[in-house]
Amino acid sequence: MRASGILMPISSLPSAHGIGAMGAEARRFVEFLSKAGQAYWQILPICPTSYGDSPYQSFSTFAGNPYFIDLDELAKRGLLLPEEYENIDWESAPDTINYGALYEKRYKVLRCAANRLLAKPNAAYRKFVKENAFWLPDYALFMALKDAHSGACWLEWEEPLRRREPEALKAAREQYADDVAFWQVVQYLFYAQWNALKGYANRMKIDIIGDLPIYVALDSVDVWSCPQEFQLDENLLPTEVAGCPPDGFSATGQLWGNPLFDWDAMAKTGYAWWVRRIRHMCSIYDVVRIDHFRGFAGYYAIPYGDKTAEHGRWREGPGYALFAAIKKKLGSPRIIAEDLGFLTEDVNALLKECGYPGMKVLEFAFDSRDGGDYRPHSYPTNCVAYTGTHDNEPVQGWFATADKTDTDRAVEYLNLTKKEGYHWGMMRGVWASTADLAVVQAQDVLGLGHESRMNTPSTLGGNWCWRALPGAFTPALAQKLNHLMELYGRLPAEAAPEDATQDPADSPSV
């Protein structure tokens, strides 16, 4: 069935408290999607961010980002007083995010809420801790230890803690019991709000497309707690790290620095770690977009310590064996495969065997540096078409920065006009395509330019900061989108029920 959606990170929602959150503005955006004839809300990873603020470099693949906890919602439930957060200066303009200010000020507010909840722990909290015992205790201890070590990477901790010696872990849990409890409560508060928001979206007939990074960060509880799942040496350092080879976009390639999975070791357990990971993602999202799908067919391995990706080499990935194990344990989860970048026959064969929809990016169709065919007339139906992703310029930014030969090709192919706006013409291109699902960036819907770009790969600073202004998603804009969805056969068959916009009533009590 033809459908459409909008890519809008949680962090980019309007907010009076420094960053987008899972409260009233999130529900308003869901209502906008429904009125605009959309069926999907695609987001970026919602895991905690670390240095550099990238959601693709997280302290945990299972935890939620504490910054996304809506403070007004906590106040409604008696966990915060207005004076504890309403007058805080988050040191950012309404259309951007200051992560340094968030780090310095947000956790102090959350500790106020956590202390009130811990004074009277309720059944819902105890149930959450029990149900998430497969990751929560390790995560909470990891974060408490990071606090105790002034944020230092776990590789710099004392040897008994680095190697997770049982006596050292037991002593740490006792010594830092209050901090461990705080980090557990924060995750309870996050998932209470997330589950309420997702339930609200689903009642409005909006499915959530979540994002799963293929790799995890070296400084993460995932590597610290499960070193046997990764390619590490006797000192627990990576032997090689992840990245991408040099290409037309980068002469030195991309050095991501993530540790690589030990696929041989994982195979011996039936890929149990990955099954747990996918099961969790399917429990919090309706659809899971797996980043860098080509890494499952073959992955690029760069010697640890190298400054660029120039001297890496290709290694064989797990192939279909991983997805067969997932299917055996979980059935057929709804997965989108991010199959962009350097593609080879083994990648195409794996995608075909899995049956997952791949991705097509319209901006790539006119980029003379890209050898793939991303023109809409060549799209298969089983794919997701995008104007661009979080790693691309918004359409207006692309026209301002791309080579004129490329932009002229786009104008000719799509018959774009300045009167309508190039961004509307490009969005029409993906909506009119044969792709089952078309997703456009929120920045394109709003007609924004380079200033709203979410991320520029291989750069540090200035990324992940864009926020929409309050009131940007107007009723008139929703009406225009709804008309275009009808025009291109992407309007959902069933509208949301009349009472779906009521304030969520099934949120766990906090």
Map each language-model feature to its residues.
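Structured C-terminal cap/extension of enzyme domains
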Residues: 447-499
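Alpha-amylase-like alpha-glycosidases and glucanotransferases acting on alpha-linked glucans and related
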Residues: 9, 15, 53-191, 216-439, ...
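Conserved, well-ordered alpha-helix/loop/beta-strand core segments that scaffold catalytic motifs
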Residues: 183-216
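Outer-envelope exported proteins of Gram-negative bacteria
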Residues: 44, 207-209, 213, 287, ...
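N-terminal regions that are enriched for targeting/export leaders
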Residues: 1-11, 27
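Long, low-complexity, intrinsically disordered segments
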Residues: 500-510
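Catalytic domains of carbohydrate-active enzymes, especially glycoside hydrolases
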Residues: 24-49, 284-285, 430
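Surface-exposed amphipathic alpha-helices with a cationic face
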Residues: 34, 194-202, 327, 351-352
